[in-house]
């Protein structure tokens, strides 16, 4: 490998909107602002909300059940 052609690899702070600070190594020269991180994302915190699609499935089956009985 050639020497002196690669950018500097240094510590960088990624700051989330919840206040969590993550230190990572990168060639990016400025700090990074995040909207969500593993500390505040609903999937990781267990506050995930399941959307009930049962009504949509029943509506679809009701609409197209007439087509399957005609055959």
From Swiss-Prot:
Part of the 50S ribosomal subunit. Pfam families: Ribosomal_L31. It comes from the Bacteria. SUPFAM superfamilies: L28p-like. Belongs to the bacterial ribosomal protein bL31 family. Type A subfamily. Coiled coil: none annotated. GO terms for biological process: translation. The keyword Ribonucleoprotein applies. It comes from Pseudoalteromonas atlantica (strain T6c / ATCC BAA-1087). Signal peptide: none annotated. PANTHER family: 50S RIBOSOMAL PROTEIN L31, CHLOROPLASTIC, LARGE RIBOSOMAL SUBUNIT PROTEIN BL31A. PROSITE patterns: RIBOSOMAL_L31 (PS01143). Keywords: Metal-binding, Ribonucleoprotein, Ribosomal protein, RNA-binding, rRNA-binding, Zinc. Its cofactor is Zn(2+). GO terms for molecular function: metal ion binding; rRNA binding; structural constituent of ribosome. One of its GO terms (cellular component) is ribosome. Binds 1 zinc ion per subunit. NCBIfam families: L31 (TIGR00105), PRK00019.1 (NF000612), PRK00528.1 (NF001809). The keyword Zinc applies. Binds the 23S rRNA. This is Large ribosomal subunit protein bL31. Zn(2+) binds at residues 16, 18, 37, 40.
